[in-house]
Amino acid sequence: MSGFAARSLGAQLGKMAEWFPVVSLTGPRQSGKSTLVKHAFPDYSYVTLEDPQIRRAALEDPVSFIRNRSERLIIDEAQYAPNLFSMIQVVSDERGTSGQYVLTGSQNFLMMKSIGQSLAGRVGLLKLLPFSFLELKDWQGERADVDEFIIKGGYPRLHATGMPPAVYFPSYIDTYIERDVAGLLDVRNKTAFHTMLAICAQCVSNLQNTSTLSKDVGVSAATIKSWLSVLESSYLVFTLQPYHSNGKKRLTKSPKLFFYDTGLLCYLLGIESVEQLVESPHFGAIFENLVVTETMKRHLNEGARPELYFYRDDSKREIDLLDFTDASHPWAVEIKSSRTYHDKYARHLQTVCDEIGIGREGRCVVARVESSFETEACSVVAVQDWLGWR
């Protein structure tokens, strides 16, 4: 499939350029950042620091690099030349206008470090993840299928070329390790890093246990923590923090681990077909990952900062997802991969929600049912409706 696929974040990108002198767009490699900024700002000059010669010029003479270029400039993979950021500050302050620079980056840690040192208060921050199901449906029409989307994920090149995930992801992972991981860490044992990535896939939607990962991979707990931080910084995985209230209930302190893209997750688990997906012992965890990640994308694409948590206490009461992004309308969401709804799915919603202040209108179970409906306890939302919510 060819042609530009409109991204939901496009409107927010334009607003940020009206409000700030600098706009930063971060996200994983190949999520569509370069395509989006070129389409959103067609009159801007464009340079990419992936080019070794351009990167060298930026590192050796940042003053000339900035002053000799257009007032409207896109700098792709800007994290490769952190010394540019102080010069961008000087020049943007001199001009005093909005929308001067658009910076993209695949390494959030390096980008935010440079922004924090030089551009604090001058930059509008946005994140672009791979396609959401809603974006893909808008592009493909009714052909978009939830189960197929889980297996393929949302990386644009996969959908633009029709490339099989089993061909795309090995190259993606190898490139990621060579360019991003090697640039931040001394990863001498690449086999161990691959092993950790595969084990993370097996632990998805579960509590993160650094000690267990350390034993399974055969490296120190400190190394695991360092590697996980890089996976998070480069938008491969993220953690959902447990919800904490002021009550006396003992709540878990460990976060849960998720992947930003279910296609990568399924590849690491060896899942290549819908049949393998629904028969997999990991299907429930993968489905939970889908709903959590797509909820996050929805908020990010609206320019909001997601406030997502999970609930688990010592009474073994658990709610898969708490969404406080809109403080006036919080959500408590149980996530079930079943095609049939059972009342037991909502058994913790009433008691926990009464305690933490989420009303009946915010209580729901997202499942693979054919259509959404209401029960006395909660709303039962078909996954296609949850993913397609505007």
PLM region descriptions:
Residues 163-330:
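Accessory nucleic acid-recognition modules appended to NTPase machines
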Residues 33:
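Conserved lysine of the Walker
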Residues 1-14:
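N-terminal pre-Walker A segment at the start of P-loop NTPase domains
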Residues 109-124, 140:
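Short regulatory helix/loop adjacent to the ATP-binding pocket of P-loop NTPases
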Residues 25:
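Hydrophobic anchor at the beta1->P-loop junction of P-loop NTPases
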Residues 85-103, 107, 117:
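Conserved catalytic/switch belt of AAA+ P-loop NTPases
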Residues 368-390:
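Domain-level recognition of nuclease-like catalytic cores that cleave nucleotide substrates
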Residues 36:
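Hydrophobic positions on the alpha1 helix immediately C-terminal to the Walker A/P-loop
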